[in-house]
Amino acid sequence: MSDTAERIKKIVVEHLGVEPDKVVENASFLDDLGADSLDIIELVMAFEEEFGVEIPDDSVEKIGTVKDAVSYIDEHKA
């Protein structure tokens, strides 16, 4: 798992209170990890702070899985 993926996993575990082994690449934040819309907003804010990236609202809709988040951040981080 990449450094980005490990850091995202840590954030997801902390914010959603899920077991680390549930946070796998293809896990859906909504369906598999039990996040609701408020959780998604909080996760995005945490990702932005952790990685120094801005994630616009139209991009948030495209980040549905852990893998989506890793890909987006890897493409946009400084």
Swiss-Prot record:
Residues 2-77 form the Carrier domain. Keywords: Cytoplasm, Fatty acid biosynthesis, Fatty acid metabolism, Lipid biosynthesis, Lipid metabolism, Phosphopantetheine, Phosphoprotein. The keyword Cytoplasm applies. InterPro entries: ACP (IPR003231), ACP-like_sf (IPR036736), PP-bd_ACP (IPR009081), Ppantetheine_attach_site (IPR006162). The modification O-(pantetheine 4'-phosphoryl)serine is found at S37. Transmembrane segments: none annotated. 4'-phosphopantetheine is transferred from CoA to a specific serine of apo-ACP by AcpS. This modification is essential for activity because fatty acids are bound in thioester linkage to the sulfhydryl of the prosthetic group. One of its GO terms (cellular component) is membrane. It is found in: Cytoplasm. It comes from the Bacteria. GO terms for molecular function: acyl binding; acyl carrier activity. Its main location: cytoplasm. GO terms for biological process: lipid A biosynthetic process. Pathway: Lipid metabolism; fatty acid biosynthesis. Belongs to the acyl carrier protein (ACP) family. Carrier of the growing fatty acid chain in fatty acid biosynthesis. NCBIfam families: acyl_carrier, PRK00982.1-2, PRK00982.1-3, PRK00982.1-4, PRK00982.1-5. This is Acyl carrier protein. It comes from Zymomonas mobilis subsp. mobilis (strain ATCC 31821 / ZM4 / CP4). The lineage of its organism: Bacteria, Pseudomonadati, Pseudomonadota, Alphaproteobacteria, Sphingomonadales.
